[in-house]
Swiss-Prot record:
Binding of S-adenosyl-L-methionine, residues: E123, R124, D176
Keywords of this entry: Cytoplasm, Methyltransferase, rRNA processing, S-adenosyl-L-methionine, Transferase
Source species: Magnetococcus marinus (strain ATCC BAA-1437 / JCM 17883 / MC-1)
Name of the protein in question: Ribosomal RNA small subunit methyltransferase J
Function: Specifically methylates the guanosine in position 1516 of 16S rRNA.
CDD domains reported for this sequence: AdoMet_MTases
């Protein structure tokens, strides 16, 4: 049984909705028809959005790739001193090449690109990859964000295959296996459970971590819940902690 259906907002979006549904083998629902699945991919005039089919949720999920470049000076320059930037090794003019091996909805990956990193995003979940592609296409068309979008290469593929086949190894591999948090801008609790089912579990995370350690030229960064145990017996070289999360940093070179 499918957990996701595709619905056009109006008949003007019918053609694109049909294309998406056919390509991914998702059920297509007529405009304003009763949705037979708990999750709904809404094809609207401004793009794609993920919704809860019960209609109770008012904050659809999209890949919100907002904001332009963050330089060494300016109102947002303080971000370059935050734990994420320090974890991946952004310092002054140095902005490493990073593989975001679990891109998700692009939050951290976009922030790294804003700070100047050359990014490779890997996302194997078709729904997430589709939302990322949509977000990047919109960013390319926006004057403020186009420069950042050009720093990002999206790979709708398994990160293990990507790392095995890259001609030039990245300086950093970034792993964030945590699923999007509940709260403002997320789906209701029941729908989040269903979305996790749709995405599947990262059963191969230990294998991905080992490959990342063998591939990254400088370091592997693993984002974890603040109080979560270490992923492996190997201890990180250092940790950077925030309010609810931490970054375990493993040097490779």
């Amino acid at each position: 049984m499918s957990l996701l259906s595709v619905m056009p907002a109006t008949t003007a979006q019918q053609s694109r909705a049909e294309q998406v549904a056919h390509h991914f083998h998702w059920p297509l629902v007529a405009v304003e028809a009763l949705c037979p699945t708990p999750l709904l991919l809404w094809v609207g005039p401004t793009g794609l959005a993920l919704k809860s089919a019960d209609g109770k949720h008012q904050h659809p999920i999209t890949a919100q790739l907002q904001g332009g470049s963050i330089g060494l000076a300016g109102p947002d320059s303080w971000v370059r001193g935050q734990p994420l930037a320090r974890a991946v090794g952004i310092k002054g003019q140095h902005t490493p090449t990073v593989v975001d091996a679990t891109a998700g909805l692009g939050g951290d990956g976009w922030l790294m690109a804003r700070m100047g990193c050359s990014m490779h995003w890997a996302e194997r979940v078709p729904l997430m990859g589709l939302l990322l592609q949509e977000g990047l296409e919109q960013a390319h068309q926006d004057a403020q964000r186009a420069e950042v979008a050009r720093r990002v290469t999206l790979h709708q593929a398994d990160a293990i295959q990507l790392l095995q086949n890259m001609q030039e190894p990245p300086q950093v591999v970034y792993l964030d296996p945590m699923f999007p948090h509940e709260g403002k801008g997320s789906l209701p609790r029941k729908a989040m459970v269903q979305l996790r089912q749709l995405a599947g579990e990262d059963q191969d995370l230990p294998q991905l971590f080992e490959l990342a350690m063998a591939t990254a030229e400088q370091r592997v960064v693993l984002k974890r819940p603040l109080k979560a145990p270490l992923l492996t017996r190997a201890k990180p070289n250092f940790q950077l902690k925030g309010r609810s999360t931490r970054f375990d940093v493993y040097a490779t070179g």
